[in-house]
Structures are given as structure tokens and as C-alpha cells.
Amino acid sequence: MQEALLKCVHEVLSATAGTKAEGVYFIGMTVKGSVVHRKIDVVVDADSGVRIDQCAFLSRRLRERLEEDEEMIGILGDNFDLVVGSPGLGEPIILDRQYGRHVGRLLRVSYSDLEGVEHELTGHLLEVSLAEGAGSIMLKPRVEKKKGKGEELENITLELGAVLRAVPEAEI
């Protein structure tokens, strides 16, 4: 079922050239429930962030595609919920290309060093390099302010291969 659904999602996304959803790409999908009532959540993004009208457009197109396919109706049943949305705040970055739209924002990053020891830091994403096979990110670590003047920390560059998890954070 997952493969057939993924195929439909990718068909709809590949047919968006020249539409309001052009540039939107697939992040992930979850399917819950039984044939009596299924819920399909499709997560998409765009390099400049996905808008609600793009999600609505893709939701309509995907629903039409699923409902016209007898095989999919047999798999999903007649009663299914379909939600197309963007990754919310606090959701981890899944694809390398998502880093670009978070430049200047605060990220919480878990990474492993050369010895395999896991570390975590929070900082502003300054730069992203998506070179083939050797991408990296540069972060300015956030200093917790205490009485007096806090120490200034050096920028840190991490290879994307060392990043275990990166999550955009809200700044207050």
C-alpha cells in the first residue's frame, strides 16, 4: 500500500510544473487506521517554504488522483482523510535541501564527532554548503547569557554526514 501511495504522490508532485505548487517537494508520509477509516498525512516543503494554498492545491490533486484509481480505492476504502501539510516548528530537518530555508534561524543540532561521541548545540545557521557528497553547515553557537559579559564562541562547521538530527527552534 505504501509503495502505491508514494507512487501517486510522486506523480502528482512531478506534474506541478507551471502550477502554483511548482517547486514543492516530498518530505514524508504516514498512513494510519484501517480500511474502515484511514488517515494519510503527506508532508511537503519548498526551498522558500510551502504556503497553505500550495498544500490545498496538492491535496485536491492527490485526492482526485487517488479517487480515480480503482486499485487505490480498493486499498484505502471509500472513507479516508488526506492531509497535505508542511513540516511544523520543532519537526526535524529530513532532507539536506531543507537547511537552505533555515539560514539565519535557530537550530538545535545533535552530531557525532570524529570519535563517534554525540554532542548537542543550539545556534543560528549561518551558512549551508550542499556540495556533492560533502555538504556542511556553519552555526554560530548561542551563548546562554548570565550576569556580566558572556564569552563569545567561535562559529562551528559541521559536515552533514556528522549531523544526527537538526531541529528548527522558536526564538523568544
Curated annotation (Swiss-Prot):
One of its GO terms (biological process) is ribosomal small subunit biogenesis. The keyword Oxidoreductase does not apply. SUPFAM superfamilies: YhbC-like, N-terminal domain. GO terms for cellular component: cytoplasm. The keyword Transmembrane helix does not apply. It is found in: Cytoplasm. Belongs to the RimP family. Required for maturation of 30S ribosomal subunits. This is Ribosome maturation factor RimP. It comes from Chlorobium phaeovibrioides (strain DSM 265 / 1930).
